[in-house]
């Protein structure tokens, strides 16, 4: 990474030493929030500060409740609550965070702040409301603009609405986007046609943000992209052709809505991956050459390897194939079906130079951002 976490921890320590805060809430996605508890804060917090740090979990017990209550004990300790952003969509998580803030001078920090980019989302509104009670607010992200410059509105608004100069998202949108009208099924809809005044927006950001690129702080070799072409098997080709014809027939003469088109595209993609999920939830296996080519590739490279796959079915097959070829202790897994605590252990195992774990296998939905490997 670029050191975002250390900068935040250092800033938290400075504010604590100056008596500005005595509490902090770190909010991060479920897939990465445990990193703050096990790595980021223990590794970077100044040694003279001995915090009372509690990790939020969905499960409750007498022991866990006692941990939570320790955050409200009086004294001079820095109290830190680490909570996943999904928990702030629940009444229980939101109420506890609000109680914590009422009892502390708090710094509220959002890691991967694109999780609050949607101004109409219930979670975004809850976090913006919560942020108003914080003494200090911070955001961190590796990609502040994921789809549109308009993603910046609520992220910056969380810090302070005056920073961009707009209390209304629609006024902000009209300033920086050209809208066009479209009719869908008799409904008039406004869509973004293009963007404008982006230099002005960039200048505003410079006044209150700090941006660093990996090239500025890491000595990494350039990425090398190599395309490996894998031929479809006869079985795949027939299935693909049949599915393509069926999809075209289904959509012919109809208004092609995005969900319909995406469903057909996903089915075609599944066929190229070597399987097809049927309407009843069962999966049909389709003979393919991908795993054989993957093993050939792994035989050619040395050192650690990260393998991403979109579908759990593919991950399971990749895990079995690599286990058979290189041994079960050569892999760690990171996707939704793996318990959160095990995921964190798998990261540490993969990072350990003395570990036999050579292959990190996961899906980008769970591990595609926010973790440092």
Locate the predicted segments by residue.
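Loop/turn-to-beta-strand initiation segments
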Residues: 77-80, 105-107, 135-138, 355-359
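Conserved helix-turn-beta segment of the N-terminal RecA-like "Helicase ATP-binding" lobe
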Residues: 32-62, 159-163, 325
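SF2 helicase/translocase ATPase core recognition
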Residues: 36, 134-170, 217-244, 358, ...
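Conserved Helicase C-terminal RecA-like lobe
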Residues: 1-29, 88, 219-371
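Conserved P-loop NTPase motor "coupling/switch" region that bridges the ATPase
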Residues: 22-23, 43, 49-53, 106-107, ...
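Substrate-gripping "pore-loop 1 plus following alpha2 helix"
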Residues: 95-102, 106, 115-130
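Conserved helix/coil segment N-terminal to the catalytic DExD/H
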Residues: 62-80, 85-104
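Walker B catalytic acidic pair
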Residues: 111-112
């Amino acid at each position: 990474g670029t050191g975002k976490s250390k900068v935040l921890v250092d800033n938290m320590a400075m504010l604590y030493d100056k008596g500005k805060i005595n509490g902090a809430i770190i909010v991060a996605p479920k897939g990465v929030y445990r990193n703050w508890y096990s790595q980021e804060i223990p590794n970077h917090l100044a040694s003279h500060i001995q915090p009372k740090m509690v990790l939020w979990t969905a499960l409750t017990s007498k022991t866990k409740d006692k941990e939570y209550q320790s955050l409200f004990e009086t004294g001079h300790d820095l109290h830190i609550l680490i909570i996943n952003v999904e928990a702030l969509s629940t009444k229980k998580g939101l109420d506890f965070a609000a109680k914590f803030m009422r009892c502390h001078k708090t710094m509220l920090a959002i890691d991967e702040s694109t999780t609050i980019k949607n101004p109409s989302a219930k979670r975004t509104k809850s976090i913006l409301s919560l942020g108003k009670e914080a003494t200090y607010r911070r955001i961190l992200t590796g990609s502040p603009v994921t789809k549109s410059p308009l993603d910046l509105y609520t992220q910056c608004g969380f810090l302070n609405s005056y920073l961009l100069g707009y209390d209304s998202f629609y006024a902000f949108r009209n300033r920086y986007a050209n809208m066009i009208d479209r009719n869908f099924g008799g409904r008039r809809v406004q869509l973004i046609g293009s963007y404008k005044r982006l230099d002005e927006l960039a200048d505003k950001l410079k006044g209150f943000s700090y941006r660093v690129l990996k090239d500025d702080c890491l000595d990494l070799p350039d990425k090398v992209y190599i395309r490996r072409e894998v031929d479809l098997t006869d079985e795949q080709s027939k299935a693909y052709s049949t599915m393509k014809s069926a999809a075209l027939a289904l959509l012919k003469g109809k208004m092609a809505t995005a969900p319909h088109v995406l469903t057909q595209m996903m089915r075609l993609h599944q066929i190229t991956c070597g399987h097809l999920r049927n309407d009843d939830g069962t999966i049909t296996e389709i003979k393919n050459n991908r795993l054989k080519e993957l093993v050939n590739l792994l035989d050619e490279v040395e050192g650690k390897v990260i393998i991403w796959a979109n579908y759990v079915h593919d991950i399971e097959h990749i895990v079995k194939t690599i286990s058979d070829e290189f041994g079960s202790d050569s892999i760690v897994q990171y996707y939704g079906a793996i318990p959160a605590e095990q995921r964190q252990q798998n990261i540490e195992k993969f990072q350990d130079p003395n570990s036999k774990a050579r292959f990190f296998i996961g899906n980008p939905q769970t591990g595609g951002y926010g973790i440092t490997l």
